[in-house]
């Protein structure tokens, strides 16, 4: 809309009317949007009187032209003399107050004027304030309230279901279809003094479906809180319950249950005169410091509900039904608690009444040794192991433990947190690291190999070791690091966990590269599974056994995707079989003899069993002529049956592989020590491994005349390597010839025995 003047014809001449007439003109979409935004802004701003130009703080933005005929241009906002500077700096405000002599009380008003000018000038970014719901900060308020009262969250109990106790239940009447559970947490200290904490009442439906809509003032979820002394001195923690329900009396008809149901009929039926109350008791051990039992975080569990009239011992403990004041007296006796708790260890409880509940902790009792934790002291940060084991840092060592760290510590002791480990030793056991080699080799005496006459199976002597067996504890050390971003003259001490690693691959860190750098993030995968399963990434380590290439200080970092023999059932079955059956080779088959096939001899029991199966064999197909009666053959050989036919057995072929087996022993020993093998890697790496092998075992190779086997191994690897080059062949071969020449020179210097 644009304003225009209306022309009126008066006395033959035209004159312009003073009142403007708005003529509708076309506007673009963007112009209309800008006009709407401007109108909204004008509506949101408070209207203030602008009688004079000097007193106005801003200019009106309404697009209405004045009816005045003066030709003076309109006054702009920036040309108006400002009463206050448009800056909210505290120093300028202070100078302004001193300059004009304003009182101190006006500082607040002056700052408001500054903020208002910045707000109207669109220099402030205003956001709508979102009020948080009470559910977001209610847990924090609850925790603060517990801290003010000296309480600590112990565990959370949720009573879920009652099984095998639903007799005489009518789902239409809530009195019989629900049970009331009164739970208690009983704490026993070192002096066998009992502290009983009541948890309130829970209502549990007897059927799977929910109860009718009745207003219960109880909840099935109970948050147990304890004070600091109770939490520190707890030796045993029991959970005791008293479950009550009602059943209709025998021999009496329930009033008002037939015909049309009314409110009066339900009230009459629910009266205590028509029902009898049943009471059951139960108790279970949740925590025991001495026996290292911790069931506070075991999830879903059950408590066997006992009837006082089931056994005379129960009647003596719980008292008679006409003595309700003695229902809680048994909780103060430690022997009664132990006796009732032992009934929960019965596994055949499918026919017994039981209460199903779940338990969850707040990480206070994740270690069995609760006595080490004092709630009155600030909780230190926990150290998480790479295997998923959490160990609390120790404080001090009360006894001398100089040589205790060198003792062998099993993973079971580390997981259970045994009390035999003192504080200093526990502080050392803060992390596990992998131990090389990943596979073990059975100890074999190479020198006495040719003197043996029995069969020695060496093919499967290299067995895989799981991660839990090749994990060793390492202790933390104090290191000094200097941060690069801050120039510090005195180095900042930061206590971290470092490896006591040397050049040996057995003590190298899993994320340490040959150059001493560490791999983090996706370059090195940490343990993410549950304990004690450990994930490993096999990387090329700093290894003296594998020489570096010429002109290189550090070798190339390569990821080794090796596959080790795991879960090899055939290998273990062979080992177990050879442990029981010992064979002796004939002289013509010993070590350097001809190829020989040996049959494992059968025992008399196996032969009799085989003949028995043949004698009772039934032929179901009558079209086939049945077997003839087995003739009696006076056979004295165990390898033949009654008919004189050989009985099938196991056999094994032996080749003249004396030198081959000895060479394999040397290779396996080297691969296990170096942690590498020249299998499926680059040609450069294969060449370096072969060079390291001849460097270490050249004395055995030349003494046992295994030269041809090493040369054959080089040629074989060269044939199966597509990227094999002349340089890769010359690296081990030149070293082999050099060592052979030195060995021959030493042999010449040795005087002959003749």
From Swiss-Prot:
In adults, it is predominantly expressed in the germline, and weakly expressed in intestinal cells. Induction: Repressed by GLD-1, which associates with the 3'-UTR of the mRNA and prevents its translation. Residues 1-83 are annotated as: Disordered. GO terms for biological process: negative regulation of gene expression; regulation of gene expression. It is found in: Nucleus. Disruption phenotype: RNAi-mediated knockdown results in ectopic expression of the homeobox protein egl-5 in the head region. This ectopic expression of egl-5 in the head region is enhanced in a nfya-1 bp4 mutant background. Signal peptide: none annotated. The keyword Transcription applies. Its main location: nucleus. One of its GO terms (cellular component) is nucleus. Residues 31-40 have a biased composition (Basic and acidic residues). It comes from the Eukaryota. Keywords: Developmental protein, Nucleus, Repressor, Transcription, Transcription regulation. The keyword Repressor applies. Changing residue 283 to Y: In BN21; temperature-sensitive allele, which produces fertile progeny at permissive temperature (16 degrees Celsius) and sterile progeny at restrictive temperature (25 degrees Celsius), probably due to a mislocation into the cytoplasm. Residues 51-61 have a biased composition (Low complexity). Component of a Polycomb group (PcG) complex. PcG proteins act by forming multiprotein complexes, which are required to maintain the transcriptionally repressive state of homeotic genes throughout development. In association with the nfya-1-NF-Y complex, may play a role in repressing the expression of the homeobox protein egl-5 in tissues such as the head. PcG proteins are not required to initiate repression, but to maintain it during later stages of development. The mes-2/mes-3/mes-6 complex may participate in the global inactivation of the X chromosomes in germline cells. Forms a heterotrimeric complex with the Polycomb proteins mes-2 and mes-3. Does not interact with mes-4. Interacts with nyfa-1. This is Polycomb protein mes-3. The lineage of its organism: Eukaryota, Metazoa, Ecdysozoa, Nematoda, Chromadorea.
